[in-house]
C-alpha cells in the first residue's frame, strides 16, 4: 500500500468558462469607471434628533415614574394592615408549633405509658414464668436424683416429692410446664443434631486462641510490668497534696451533692410523670390516630404486590437506578477532580489568608494599646447610648405612625381590593382586554426600542426616499441589456460552480477513502510503535525498580549491620553492667551481713555479761538467805532448849497456845523491821535490774542506729553508681540511635528523591507524548466526524422525507379503517344492548315470581315449626324435670350407699386373703420389700408403657365420644321461642339437679402386713353404674 498511487481524471470545459468570463469583462469595461454619489453630512441633524428623543424619553420616564411613585405613596397606608397580617401569620406559627409540640408530647406520653405497661408486664411475666422455670429446674433435679437412686424407699420419697411439686402448680402452670418440657426436649434434639460440628468449632477456636495467647505472652508481661509501674505511680500520686485536697473535697462535698442530685432526679421524674398524666388524653388520641394510619399502611402495602403501577415503578427504578448511581458517581468524581485542580490555588489562598490573619493579629495586638483606638472606644461609649436612644425613638415614631395610618390603610386596602377585584372580573369576563393589554405593552416596548433606530436612519439617509430611488434603479438595471447579460453570466457561473463542486466532492471522496486506508496503516504502525515504547518503558521501570530495590536492600543491610553491632555492644554492656551490679549487691549484702554479725556478737556479749552478773547476784542473794535461815534456825534452837522444860510442864494445850501466842507476838513485834528490810532489798534489786536493762537497751539502740546508717549509706552509694551507669548507657544509646535514625532517614530521603525525580521525568515524557497523540487523534477524529456528520445528515434528510410520506399514507388509511370500524361497532353495540335489556327484563320478572313463591312456602313452614315448638314447650312447662332428675339421682345414690358396706367387707376379706396366699405360693417372708423393690416397680413401668402405647387409642376414642356427644343440629332461621319460658329457668333447674348429682370421691386403701401397698379412688356414681352395667 505504501507504493500505491492515486490517479484522478478531471474533465473541465475551460474554454467555455474563459469565453463566458470574457463576455463578463466586456460588460464591465462598458460600465463607467467612476460612480459619484452625493452624500450630505447631516451629523448636526442626527445629534439634534437624538437629543430631542432623549429629552422626550426622559420626560416620559420621569412623568410615568412620578405617577407610579404617587400611586404607591397613596397606597402606602395599605402596607400597615398587610404588615399586621404578616405579623399575624408569623404569630400563628407559634400556636402551630405549640400544637406540633403538644402532639409530640402526647405521643411521648403514650409511648412512656406503653413502656411502663410493657415493663410491668415484663415484671409480672418474669414472676409467672420464673415460677414455671423454677418448677422445671426442681423437677430436673428430682428426676436426676431419681435416676441415681437405687433404694426403693428413696425412689418412693423422690416420687412423692415430684407428685407434691406437680400438685402445687395450677392448671395453667402445669400446662406451661408441659410446654416448657416439650420445648426443652425439642431443643435438646436440635442441640444433639448439631453437637459435633459445634464442638469441633469450639475446639478449633480454643486452639487458635491458645496459639494467639502464646504469641502474645510478651505483651502480657509488658502489660503486667506497665500495670505495676502505673500502680506505683498512682500510689505516689495519691500521696500528693492536690490529691489529698481532692479527697478532702469529696469527703466534704460529695454527700451534699449526692442528696441534691437525688432530689433533682426525683423532681424530674415527678415532672415527667405529671406531664404523662396531663398529656394522657392527647396521647390516647394520637395512639388511635397512629393505629388507624398504620392499619391503612398495612392495607396499602398489602395491595402493592398486585398493583400494576407499583410494578411499573419498580421496573422503572430497576432500569434507572443504576443510571442515578452512575450520575452521582460521575458528579462525585468530577467534583473531586475539580477540587483537586483547585488544590494549588486553594493552598496559595490559604497561605495568603494566613499572612493576612497574621498581619491582622499584629494590628489588633498593637491597636488595643494605641491612643486612637482608646479614643474610638470612648467615642462609642459616649455616643452609643445616644444612637440606641435615637433608634428607639425612631422606632416608636414609626409604630405610632403605623397606628395612626391603620384606619386610612384599611380604607385604602379596601379600595385596592375593589380595584383588583374589578380588574380580575373584567379580564375574566372579557379575555380580549387582557390580550389587548399584553399586546399594547409588547408594542410599547418594541416601539421604544425601534424609535431611536428609525430616527437615526431617517436623519442620516434623508428619509426613506433614497431607498425607494435605489430600488427603482435596481429594477431598471434588471430589465436593461447589461442586467440581462449579467444575469446570464451569473447563471453560467452557478452552473460552472456546481460542476466544479461535484468534481471536488468526487475527488474529496476518493482522497477520503485513501486517507482512511493510510490512517489504518498509520494506526497499525502507531500500535507497533506504542508496543515497542511500552516494552521499553516497562524495561525502564523494571530497571529503575530493581535499582531502587537494590539501593533499599543495601541501605537496609547496612542499617541492619549497624543496628546488629549496636545491639550486640549494648547487650554486652548491659551484661557487664548487670554483673557489676550483681557483684556490688553481693558485696553490699556481705558487708551488711558482717555488720549484723558484729552487732549480734556485741549484743550477745553484753547480754551474756549481764546474765552472768545477774546469776552471780542471784547466787549471793541465795547464799545470804541460806545464811540468814541458818542463824534463825540456831536462835530458834537455843530458845527451844531454854523453853523446853517450861513447855513440857505446860502440857499439849499449853504448848499449842504458847506457840501461837509467841509466833503472833514475834511477828507483831518485828513487823516494821521485816517490812522495811523486805522493801529495801526489793528496791535495790529492782533498781539494779532497771539500770542494767537501760544500759542494754541504750547499747542495742546505738548498735542498731549505726547499722541502719551504714546500710543506708551503702544503698545510696550503690543507687548513685547504678543511676550514673544507667544514664551513661541511656545517653550513649540515644546518641547511637539518633545517628542510625539520621543516617537511615538521609538514605531513605535520597531514595525517595531519586524515585520522585525518575517518576517526574517519566510523567513529563508520557504527558507530552500523550498530549501529542491526543492532539493528532483529535484532529483526525474531527475530520472523520465532520465527514460522517455530513453523510449522516443527508441520510437523515432522505429518511425523514420517506418517513413523512409513509406516515401521511398510513395515517389516512388508518383513519378510514377507524371510521369504518367505528360505524360497524356502534351498530353491533346497539343490537347487543337491545337484546341484553330484553333478556335482563325477562330474567328479572322470572326471578321475582320464584322469589315470591319461595317466600310464601318458607313462611308457611316457619308458622308450622312455631306451632310445633310452642306445643312442645307447653308440654314441658307442666312437667318438673328438676324433681324427676333429682329423684332418679337420689335413688341411684341410695342404692350405692346401701351396698357400700358389702363392698368394703368384700374388699377386707380379699385384702386379708391376699397376703397369706401370696406368702404361701411365692414363699415371701417380707412382702413389703418384694412389693416395693420388684412388683411395685414393674407395675409402675408396665402402667407407663401401657398408657404410652394406648395414648393414640384413647385420643381417638375421646374424639369419637366428643363427636357423638355433640350432634349436628340444623339451623332453622327465624325460629321464634315463646318468651314466657326463659333460658334462665332451664339453666337454673339443670344446675340444681347437678348439685345433688355430684358425689365425693371414695379412697380405697390396700394394706399388706399392716402396710399400705396400694391406693385406688372410686370415681363418681356415673362411672360406677357404668362399670356395673358392663359386668352384667
UniProtKB/Swiss-Prot annotation:
Residues 131-178 form a coiled coil. The lineage of its organism: Viruses, Duplodnaviria, Heunggongvirae, Uroviricota, Caudoviricetes. It comes from Bacillus phage SPP1. It is found in: Virion. One of its GO terms (biological process) is viral tail assembly. Transmembrane segments: none annotated. The keyword Coiled coil applies. Keywords: Coiled coil, Viral release from host cell, Viral tail assembly, Virion. GO terms for cellular component: virion component. This is Tail tape measure protein gp18. Serves as a base for tail tube protein polymerization and acts as a template for tail length determination. It comes from the Viruses.
Amino acid at each position: 500500500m505504501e507504493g500505491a498511487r492515486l490517479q484522478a481524471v478531471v474533465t473541465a470545459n475551460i474554454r467555455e468558462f474563459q469565453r463566458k468570463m470574457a463576455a463578463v469583462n466586456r460588460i464591465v469595461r462598458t460600465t463607467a469607471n467612476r460612480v459619484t454619489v452625493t452624500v450630505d453630512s447631516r451629523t448636526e441633524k442626527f445629534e439634534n434628533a437624538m437629543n430631542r428623543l432623549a429629552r422626550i424619553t426622559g420626560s416620559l420616564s420621569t412623568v410615568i415614574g412620578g405617577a407610579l411613585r404617587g400611586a404607591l405613596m397613596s397606597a402606602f397606608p395599605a402596607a400597615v394592615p398587610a404588615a399586621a397580617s404578616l405579623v399575624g401569620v408569623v404569630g400563628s406559627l407559634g400556636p402551630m408549633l405549640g400544637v406540633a409540640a403538644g402532639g409530640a408530647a402526647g405521643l411521648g406520653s403514650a409511648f412512656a405509658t406503653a413502656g411502663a405497661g410493657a415493663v410491668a408486664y415484663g415484671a409480672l411475666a418474669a414472676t409467672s414464668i420464673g415460677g414455671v422455670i423454677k418448677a422445671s429446674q426442681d423437677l430436673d433435679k428430682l428426676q436426676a436424683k431419681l435416676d441415681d437412686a437405687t433404694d426403693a424407699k428413696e425412689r418412693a420419697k423422690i416420687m412423692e416429692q415430684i407428685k407434691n411439686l406437680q400438685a402445687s402448680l395450677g392448671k395453667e402452670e402445669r400446662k406451661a410446664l408441659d410446654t416448657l418440657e416439650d420445648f426443652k426436649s425439642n431443643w435438646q434434639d436440635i442441640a444433639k443434631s448439631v453437637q459435633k460440628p459445634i464442638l469441633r468449632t469450639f475446639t478449633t477456636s480454643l486452639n487458635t486462641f491458645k496459639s494467639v495467647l502464646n504469641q502474645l505472652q510478651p505483651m502480657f508481661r509488658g502489660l503486667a510490668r506497665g500495670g505495676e509501674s502505673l500502680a506505683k505511680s498512682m500510689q505516689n500520686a495519691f500521696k500528693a497534696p492536690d490529691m489529698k485536697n481532692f479527697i478532702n473535697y469529696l469527703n466534704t462535698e460529695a454527700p451534699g451533692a449526692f442528696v441534691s442530685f437525688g432530689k433533682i432526679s426525683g423532681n424530674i421524674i415527678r415532672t415527667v410523670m405529671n406531664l404523662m398524666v396531663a398529656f394522657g388524653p392527647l396521647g390516647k388520641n394520637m395512639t388511635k390516630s397512629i393505629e388507624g394510619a398504620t392499619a391503612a399502611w398495612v392495607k396499602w402495602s398489602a395491595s402493592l404486590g398486585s398493583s400494576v403501577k407499583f410494578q411499573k415503578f419498580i421496573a422503572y427504578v430497576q432500569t434507572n437506578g443504576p443510571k442515578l448511581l452512575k450520575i452521582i458517581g460521575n458528579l462525585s468524581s468530577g467534583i473531586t477532580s475539580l477540587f483537586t485542580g483547585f488544590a494549588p490555588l486553594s493552598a496559595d489562598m490559604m497561605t495568603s489568608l494566613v499572612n493576612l490573619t497574621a498581619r491582622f493579629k499584629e494590628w489588633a495586638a498593637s491597636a488595643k494599646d494605641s491612643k486612637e483606638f482608646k479614643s474610638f472606644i470612648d467615642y462609642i461609649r459616649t455616643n452609643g447610648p445616644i444612637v440606641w436612644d435615637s433608634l428607639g425613638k425612631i422606632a416608636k415614631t414609626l409604630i405610632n405612625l403605623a397606628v395612626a395610618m391603620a384606619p386610612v390603610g384599611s380604607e385604602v386596602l379596601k379600595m385596592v381590593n375593589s380595584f383588583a377585584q374589578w380588574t380580575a372580573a373584567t379580564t375574566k369576563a372579557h379575555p380580549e382586554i387582557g390580550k389587548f393589554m399584553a399586546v399594547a405593552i409588547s408594542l410599547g416596548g418594541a416601539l421604544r426600542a425601534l424609535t431611536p433606530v428609525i430616527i437615526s436612519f431617517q436623519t442620516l439617509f434623508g428619509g426613506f426616499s433614497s431607498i425607494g430611488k435605489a430600488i427603482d434603479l435596481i429594477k431598471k438595471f434588471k430589465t436593461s441589456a447589461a442586467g440581462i447579460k449579467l444575469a446570464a453570466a451569473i447563471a453560467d457561473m452557478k452552473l460552472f460552480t456546481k460542476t466544479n463542486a461535484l468534481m471536488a466532492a468526487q475527488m474529496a471522496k476518493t482522497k477520503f477513502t485513501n486517507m482512511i486506508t493510510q490512517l489504518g496503516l498509520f494506526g497499525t504502525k502507531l500500535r507497533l510503535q506504542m508496543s515497542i515504547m511500552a516494552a521499553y518503558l516497562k524495561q525502564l521501570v523494571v530497571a529503575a525498580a530493581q535499582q531502587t530495590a537494590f539501593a533499599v536492600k543495601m541501605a537496609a543491610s547496612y542499617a541492619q549491620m549497624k543496628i546488629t553491632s549496636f545491639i550486640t555492644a549494648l547487650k554486652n554492656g548491659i551484661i557487664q553492667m548487670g554483673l557489676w551490679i550483681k557483684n556490688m549487691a553481693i558485696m553490699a549484702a556481705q558487708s551488711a551481713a558482717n555488720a549484723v554479725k558484729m552487732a549480734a556478737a556485741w549484743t550477745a556479749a553484753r547480754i551474756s555479761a549481764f546474765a552472768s552478773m545477774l546469776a552471780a547476784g542471784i547466787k549471793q542473794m541465795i547464799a545470804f538467805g541460806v545464811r540468814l535461815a541458818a542463824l534463825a534456825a540456831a536462835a530458834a534452837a537455843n530458845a527451844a532448849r531454854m523453853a523446853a522444860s517450861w513447855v513440857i510442864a505446860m502440857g499439849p494445850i499449853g504448848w499449842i497456845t504458847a506457840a501461837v501466842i509467841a509466833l503472833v507476838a514475834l511477828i507483831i513485834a518485828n513487823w516494821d523491821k521485816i517490812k522495811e528490810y523486805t522493801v529495801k532489798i526489793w528496791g535495790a534489786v529492782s533498781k539494779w535490774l532497771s539500770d542494767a536493762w537501760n544500759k542494754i537497751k541504750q547499747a542495742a539502740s546505738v548498735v542498731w542506729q549505726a547499722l541502719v546508717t551504714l546500710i543506708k549509706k551503702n544503698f545510696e552509694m550503690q543507687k548513685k553508681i547504678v543511676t550514673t551507669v544507667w544514664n551513661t548507657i541511656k545517653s550513649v544509646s540515644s546518641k547511637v540511635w539518633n545517628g542510625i535514625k539520621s543516617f537511615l532517614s538521609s538514605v531513605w530521603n535520597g531514595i525517595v528523591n531519586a524515585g520522585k525525580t525518575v517518576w517526574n521525568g517519566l510523567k513529563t515524557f508520557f504527558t507530552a507524548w500523550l498530549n501529542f497523540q491526543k492532539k493528532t487523534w483529535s484532529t483526525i477524529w474531527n475530520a472523520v466526524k465532520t465527514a460522517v456528520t455530513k453523510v449522516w445528515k443527508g441520510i437523515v434528510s432522505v429518511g425523514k422525507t420517506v418517513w413523512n410520506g409513509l406516515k401521511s399514507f398510513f395515517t389516512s388509511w388508518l383513519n378510514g379503517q377507524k371510521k369504518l370500524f367505528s360505524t360497524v361497532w356502534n351498530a353491533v353495540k346497539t343490537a347487543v344492548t337491545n337484546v341484553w335489556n330484553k333478556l335482563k327484563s325477562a330474567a328479572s320478572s322470572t326471578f321475582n315470581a320464584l322469589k315470591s313463591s319461595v317466600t310464601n312456602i318458607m313462611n308457611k313452614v316457619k308458622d308450622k315449626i312455631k306451632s310445633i315448638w310452642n306445643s312442645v314447650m307447653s308440654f314441658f312447662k307442666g312437667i318438673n324435670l328438676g324433681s324427676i332428675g333429682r329423684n332418679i339421682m337420689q335413688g341411684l345414690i341410695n342404692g350405692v350407699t346401701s351396698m357400700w358396706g358389702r363392698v368394703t367387707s368384700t374388699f377386707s376379706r380379699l385384702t386379708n386373703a391376699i397376703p397369706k396366699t401370696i406368702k404361701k405360693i411365692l414363699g415371701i417372708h417380707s412382702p413389703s420389700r418384694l412389693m416395693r423393690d420388684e412388683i411395685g416397680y414393674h407395675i409402675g413401668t408396665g402402667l407407663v408403657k401401657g398408657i404410652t402405647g394406648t395414648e393414640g387409642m384413647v385420643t381417638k376414642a375421646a374424639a369419637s365420644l366428643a363427636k357423638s356427644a355433640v350432634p349436628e343440629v340444623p339451623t332453622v332461621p327465624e325460629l321464634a321461642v315463646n318468651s314466657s319460658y326463659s333460658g334462665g329457668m332451664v339453666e337454673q333447674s339443670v344446675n340444681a339437679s347437678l348439685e345433688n348429682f355430684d358425689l365425693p370421691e371414695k379412697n380405697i386403701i390396700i394394706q399388706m402386713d399392716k402396710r399400705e401397698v396400694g391406693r385406688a379412688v372410686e370415681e363418681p356414681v356415673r362411672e360406677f353404674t357404668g362399670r356395673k352395667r358392663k359386668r352384667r
